[in-house]
From Swiss-Prot:
CDD domains for the chain: IgC1_MHC_I_alpha3
Summary of subunit composition and partner proteins: Heterodimer of an alpha chain and a beta chain (beta-2-microglobulin).
Protein name: DLA class I histocompatibility antigen, A9/A9 alpha chain
Subcellular location as annotated: Membrane
GO molecular function annotation: peptide antigen binding; signaling receptor binding
Amino acid sequence: MEVVMPRALLVLLSAALALTPTRAGSHSLRYFYTSVSRPGAGDPRFIAVGYVDDTQFVRFDSDAATGRMEPRAPWVEQEGPEYWDRQTRTIKETARTFRVDLDTLRGYYNQSEAGSHTRQTMYGCDLGPDGRLLRGYSQDAYDGADYIALNEDLRSWTAADTAAQITQRKWEAAGVAELQWRNYLETTCVEWLRRYLEMGKETLLRADPPSTRVTHHPVSDHEVTLRCWALGFYPAEITLTWQRDGEDQTQDTEVVDTRPAGDGTFQKWAAVVVPSGQEQRYTCHVQHEGLPEPITRRWEPSPLSTIVIVSIAALVLLVVAGVIGAVIWRKQRSGGKGPGYSHAARDDSAQGSDVSLTAPRV
C-alpha cells in the first residue's frame, strides 16, 4: 500500500506562517478523504474536505465540473492562484494514490472486483490555548471499519487486523511515522492552523451564544417530555444538562449530537420524561463559550395557554352562577312566599296564564 500522506502535503503547506491565536481555547485543523470504487462506472469517486475548528474551508470532488480544490469559506478566498494550484495538484495526486489503495486493499481481503468499496482517512492537529500542539492524529478506515491509526507518540501504528498489519510493516520499514507524519503534524500542520486562524479570525474566533428554550410534549396522561433547545451557537462545543430539584439527571437524559444548522452555527437538544404536574421541579442548564455565565431554563407555559385556562375557568364560573340564579328564581316563582300560603281557586282557563289571583272566598 502506497504512502498516502503527507509527502504531497509538505509541498502544499511549505509556506506556513507562525501566527498566534487571539482567543483562549483549543483549535483544530482536520482533513477528511473518502474514495469510493464503482465497478463498471469508471474511476472511484474521491472527495476531500478540510475543516478549521467546526468550519469547512476547502472541498474537492472528483465528479465536480471544475476539477479543482474549491474554497468553502470567504476568508480563504484571499489566498492567491498559486495556493489553489498547489492544493489541486496535491489532492489529485492523493486521489490517484487512493485509487491504487482500493485495489491493494481488495487484494488484502480477497475480495472480488464486483463490489463497491470505501477507503477513508482523517488526519490533523489540535492546538491548546497557548498555541502549542495538543495532539496530532491520522486514522484510516476501509469499508467503514477501522484499519490503521497513528499512535499518540506519533512514532508507531496500531493495526486493526491482519490485513492492516501488512500496511503497518511497510510503513514501519519506510519510517513513514517518524520521517513524515510526525514532522507534518508537529510543525507544518500547526503553522498552517495558526495561519488560517489569523486569516479567518473574525469568523473562526467568534463566540455566538445559543438561544435557548424548553418545549413541552405530552407522552401520556401521566408523563410529558421536556426538551431543552440550544440554537444558533458557535463554536460547536456546548453542554446541556437536566436537573431535578438541583440533582443531575444524566442517566435519564436523552441528548442528540450537535448538528450544523446550515448557516455556520449549530444546534442541539436534551430531553427528559417527567411526571405530569412536576415540570417546575426540572431545570435545564446550558454552558457555552459565548455565554458570560451558564444559564438555567424551565418550561414556561405560553401566555396563550394561561389565557385559555383562565377563560375556561371564568366560563365555568359563569355557567355555575347562571344555574344557581335560575334555581333561586324558580323557587321564588313557585314557593317562595312562605308556609300556609295557597293559591285561590281559579278556572281552568286561567291556568298557565299571567292573570291576577282573585281574593279567596270566605
